[in-house]
Amino acid sequence: FRMKVSCRNFLEYDCAADLEKLDFGAMEGGVKHIGGGSNLLFTADFPGTILHSAIRFIEQKDGSLVSVGAGVVFDELCEWAAERGLWGPENLSHIPGEVGAAAVQNIGAYGVEAKDIIRTVHCFDTRSRRFTDFEVADCRYGYRESIFKSEEYRDRYIVTAVDFVFRRDGAPVLGY
């Protein structure tokens, strides 16, 4: 839409440890963390700081367990998994956005939701200034919902990485 809007500061980080260096309480005008911006439209200037994750890694840890940086484009993860014969995210291919946002929004399509393949969401707690992990059961996933969208958690936790569990069975989900 080419909106002529701006923010006070735009900070992109490529390492989760960089978040520990920020003084969130001292940032004038507030702080907003964004993903790729595919579901976002600023219609006025933002007086504060915008943060964006450039944490981009995909690491196969143990067979079907894959750890992914929050800044990875979700469709790139789908392609990566397909190239390795890993099943689970294929129905979510071409959904715009990044891995961190996928965990926050519980993206879904064709009978599959992010919660079905997420094991752990790794976060930075801006209040305690510590890293913490949320197992999938703790994320309170629902239809396009999660604990990270709640009033209490929305601006408190920043997703830094997500662990997924994929399958090797070669069986697509076709029950939609």
Label each PLM-derived region with a short phrase.
Residues 1-121, 125-127:
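Anion-binding (especially nucleotide phosphate/pyrophosphate-binding) glycine-rich loop
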Residues 2-3, 40, 131-176:
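Phosphate/pyrophosphate- and phosphate-bearing ligand-binding catalytic cores of soluble enzymes
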